[in-house]
Amino acid sequence: YGANVTVKDGAAKKNTAEISGGTVTGNVYGGVLTAVAATKNATGGSAHITGGSVGGNVYGGAITDAAASGNVTGSSVHVAGGTVTGTVYGGHNAGTGTATGGIVTITGGHMGAVYGGYTATTGAATTGNTINLGTADTVTPAGTVTAAGTPVAAGTSIGNIYGGNQS
């Protein structure tokens, strides 16, 4: 966990989890609200996987309780290596709120399905989510390329890809 907020009125903001090796048997969360009926938001959480093995899912930001009313916004995941047995979520909301602005960037590794944003509630917004396969070149306003981006590594494997999804 970058942060695990267990109080109803607590918020998770700009927390990061990094995995570079070893084995994680459960889930990895950048920032997560696990309180029953949480009312605040999980904002800007991030998870970075560069090696090792994750036996569960990877979440940039998440709210785990179905009775929660907060939103998951601006969360991100970068997978550059390693293996994720489960699913990768930029943002995941099991409550009644939204999962918006999630970004997943994949430059390597092996994983199951990938979601930019996911909500468990029909009608809850999953807008503005992005999945990047590789990273972009840096371009100046004049149009000059100043740094090469990172392509997806050879041998990378990904299951299904979803920009946003409502349960």
Residue map of PLM features:
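Surface-exposed loop/turn motifs in large extracellular/passenger domains
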Residues: 1-27, 32-57, 62-87, 92-113, ...
